[in-house]
Amino acid sequence: MAMTMIQLCYAGVTLFARATLVHGLSPRVFILYRQAFATIFIFPFLYLSRRKSKIAISSLDLKSFSLIFLVSLIGITINQNLYLEGLYLTSSSMGSAVGNIIPAITFLISFLAGYEKLNLRDIRGLAKIAGTILCVAGAISMTLLRGPKILNSESALPIAKSVLGHLKDQNTWLIGCLFLFSSTLCWSFWLILQVPISAYYPDNLSLSAWMCLFGTIQCAVVTFFLEKDPNAWILHSYSEFATCLYAGIGASALSFTVQAWAIAKRGPVFSALFNPLCTVIVTILAALFFHEEIYTGSLIGGLGVILGLYTVLWGKAKDVMMNQDQRDNDQKSEVKIHIEDSSNTTICNKDLKNPLLSKHKSTEEIQTHQQLY
């Protein structure tokens, strides 16, 4: 349920961010304010929660500082800048659809890193490979095979705010997709890096707070060097302010905390498997309310991505059941050992130095008991 709510937040950010960027807000400024609002929200919440529970905020040593700084650089600064540039140059539907290859990429990297197991002699192991290939092929077809237009008409794209400047229209789609693919790689690495970081720094709320703070500092440096126009730093409408605030609180502060918790419990691939839900929501709402065009190639590729994704999910289902059986067996073994240890424990001490009742008390109590009955 928590991961489903996160995908709803991401879908809202994708739609509203696309609309805000098209109307003139710089992608880099949007990311900066998003992370700043997330930091402003999460640190007081962290302080109040720790004060109420009387638990100190986890401090940072050199290793944890380096790991969190690296994760913030990959998962926030680089990832979000690439994603919003790609989102600006393509569409909301494309931005969410390309994210469907994140589970396949995450599974592949997790396998190479030793977090996922793969048995080529098992049909489920082969399903993981086939599903991964199908996901990648579907994503490529979405990019290269646009085909006939199914829904809505094409709208002009003002690209003066793009970091690339003015481009020909036929180049914007391909370059935007390249940005989106690069963003998915960064996000997959971010999910996988959560495993060693969570093991070394298990405080998920503090981890999210530090990531938001480091991301804000990094994004401020990037925006300072790339955004030369001082007017670009100003939020000119309530809709821009509301979008940045919503993205910061919902899609950064809260989602980072929940995802860190989910990854610690179920692993990075489990967290990545919920991305197709965001695609379905965004595609429907973008076509209905924002009149974004839908192409045949994108539709076929999207279906291929989702089919490949759930092929991988079916392949992973056996691993989940095996892990659950292993945990159940471990728990049964612990209970059995506990019972055996308890049976060897002396329950009653027979060698008392002094009797519990004296002879007089025992005789008097027996007589009283007989009189009552």
UniProtKB/Swiss-Prot annotation:
Positions of the EamA domain: 9-135, 186-313
A Gene Ontology cellular-component term: membrane
Subcellular location field: Membrane
Keywords from the UniProt entry: Membrane, Repeat, Transmembrane, Transmembrane helix
Highest taxon of the lineage: Eukaryota
Membrane-spanning ranges: 2-22, 29-49, 55-75, 94-114, 125-145, 173-193, 205-225, 244-264, 270-290, 294-314
UniProt GO molecular function: transmembrane transporter activity
Mode of membrane association: Multi-pass membrane protein
Protein family: Belongs to the drug/metabolite transporter (DMT) superfamily. Plant drug/metabolite exporter (P-DME) (TC 2.A.7.4) family.
PANTHER family: WAT1-RELATED PROTEIN (PTHR31218)
Protein name: WAT1-related protein At4g30420
Organism: Arabidopsis thaliana
Source lineage: Eukaryota, Viridiplantae, Streptophyta, Embryophyta, Tracheophyta
